[in-house]
Regions:
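Extreme N-terminal basic, low-complexity initiation segments
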Residues: 1-15
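Intrinsically disordered, low-complexity segments enriched in serine/proline and basic residues
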Residues: 22-24, 29-30, 35, 44
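A helix-coil-helix interface module used to build multimeric assemblies
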Residues: 45-246, 250-257, 317-320, 335, ...
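Glycine-rich cofactor/substrate-binding loops
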Residues: 45-81, 143, 309, 324-508
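Generic, well-ordered alpha-helical scaffold segments in large soluble proteins
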Residues: 85, 106-113, 135, 139, ...
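Charged, flexible cofactor/metal-binding loops and thiol motifs
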Residues: 161-166, 173, 181, 188, ...
């Protein structure tokens, strides 16, 4: 079963578990076919004569304990692993082939209902695993109860999550690649457009726009590698670990692993049911990637402002004002900036859940899903937004070139000229600082200073005014950066070739 694409973003109020509000949608499942749990109070469950307990669960505990409102998005993984598990049980002689066929047929009907949105959820469905088993038993009869042979919800849920995380990491790699292609295309289009480079948001040194954009390409390349690592770390099958100590049947975990696309099985049952490292890996990769997107968003907000005027965002990714008709607001870029701490928060919060958690399974681990699911949704949405927005940005070559024409950003080049004339760099730095002060105090450009004024600062520099004025030409500033990875056109072209190779070497 191929997992369906993650649904749109949800708030905690949508889930209806942290705020106490009624859940109006079921993330990952049908929107209106089931009861409004957990926001609606389920009635107290009747106790079975075989129950361990003397009184039923309190309704508020049922609401606290239930995860069905958010974990039902795992149904594709749950059905797939149940199907593989049933086949393995029959192949090992643990259940009959007739029981296997009945289970497979019943799971097919369950899958159809879930896909079509007709699955009859009930308010006493604690989680997606129990909902699937309950419905399977309604369809197939008592044989449905055989499916849980040699399986615990402890290894069942972590298997679902490993499959979901693996598939999400694969999607992230594809989506990041798409954004990398957009960045590379825009860098190629603007390879030789001068602009200021900044430190402390102050003009520092001139660069080419293509060079600047390629910085994001390499950030994204590292992000893609992190998700490839996450995919690999999600590739060990936990199913067969049982509750924690293994199971009392001679199962074939390798068969199930192969059927579900896992590379291997977890070698230790305790670690298998209690480990959530692969979720932390995804959250970490998503947090770093979201931080990179936030930096892109922040720059687009600045650059599209009237004060900078370096670019105009596409109308399709902008909004207006409810009161000021002239406004064109960079909302999409601002949200790229604002979504990052949300994902970082999920990483921090889930580290807190896992911190000092005794082995093996604890109900604390139920919290893994919301942190993971919302991070997946947020990242996929922001990656799509970043690509769509950046593809349509119109850059203003004249404004960028004019901003990069400020002679003050040639100060380092003047210092390097003095170094070539024999001065130690630290001394040259001081000389140029004095030259800048003279120009600022007199309200003139560096090129407007007279020979005597330059001589007062440093006689050696006054003897080389022709070289000084050559350094003050914009093309000289840019093309002097000849080191590998630098901003000279030759070096930027090298970076473009490396970027194309990066995409070609890891072609999907």
């Amino acid at each position: 079963v191929s997992p369906t694409r993650a649904p749109p973003l949800h708030t905690n109020a949508d889930y209806g578990i942290w705020t106490g509000h009624t859940a109006s949608v079921y993330p990952g499942g049908p929107a209106a076919t089931g009861p409004p749990f957990p926001g609606a109070r389920p009635g107290a469950r009747k106790l079975s004569a075989l129950s361990r307990f003397h009184e039923p669960q309190h309704p508020d505990f049922q609401r606290l304990n239930a995860s069905i409102a958010f974990d039902q998005r795992l149904w594709p993984q749950d059905v797939a692993q149940s199907r593989a598990h049933a086949r393995m049980l029959a192949d090992r002689g643990i259940i009959s082939s007739e029981d296997r066929d009945a289970l497979i047929a019943g799971l097919g009907e369950v899958e159809r209902e879930l896909r079509e949105g007709t699955f009859p959820f009930r308010d006493d469905d604690e989680d997606i695993h129990m909902a699937v088993e309950r419905r399977l038993t309604e369809i197939a009869g008592a044989v449905g109860g055989r499916l849980h042979t040699a399986r615990s919800r402890n290894d069942q849920v972590v298997t679902d999550l490993a499959m979901y995380t693996r598939d999400s990491a694969r999607r992230a790699q594809r989506e990041i690649r798409g954004l990398m292609e957009v960045v590379l295309s825009r860098a190629e289009q603007h390879i030789d457009w001068p602009m200021p480079g900044y430190t402390h948001l102050q003009r520092a040194q001139p660069v080419y726009l293509g060079h600047h954009l390629l910085a994001y390409f390499w950030m994204l390349a590292r992000d893609r590698s992190r998700f490839a690592f996450t995919e690999s770390e999600s590739g060990r099958l936990p199913l067969g670990s049982g509750a924690l100590a293994g199971v009392n049947f001679d199962t074939d975990r390798g068969q199930v692993a192969e059927a579900l696309g896992f590379e291997s099985v977890t070698p230790n049952s305790i670690d298998g049911v209690s480990g959530r490292d692969f979720i932390l890996d995804y959250l970490s990769a998503a947090a770093t990637c979201s931080t990179h997107l936030s930096r892109l968003g922040a720059e687009l907000v600045l650059w599209s402002s009237s004060e900078f005027g370096f670019c105009e965002l596409p109308d399709a990714w902008s909004s207006g004002s409810s009161i000021m008709p002239q406004k064109k607001n960079p909302d999409a870029a601002e949200l790229l900036r604002a979504k990052a701490p949300r994902v970082v928060g999920h990483l921090s919060a889930f580290h807190g859940v896992m911190h000092a958690l005794p082995l093996t399974y604890n109900k604390d681990l139920q919290e893994d899903k919301e942190h993971l699911f919302d991070s997946v949704d947020t990242l996929e949405l922001t990656l799509a937004a970043a690509g769509g927005m950046l593809a349509g940005v119109r850059f203003n070559r004249e404004r960028m070139r004019d901003a990069a024409s400020d002679e003050m950003i040639a100060a380092t080049d003047i210092a390097d000229l003095l170094v070539k004339l024999g001065l130690p760099f630290r001394e040259a730095h001081g000389v140029v600082a004095g030259l800048v002060r003279t120009a600022v105090d007199s309200g003139r450009a560096l090129s407007e200073l007279s020979g005597p004024e330059i001589s007062l600062v440093n006689p050696l520099l006054a003897e080389h005014t022709q070289e000084l004025h050559s350094v003050l030409e914009q093309s000289s500033w840019l093309e002097s950066k000849v080191s590998e990875g630098g901003t000279s056109l030759a070096r930027v072209r090298e970076q473009l070739e490396l970027a194309r190779a990066e995409l070609g070497d890891r072609d999907e």
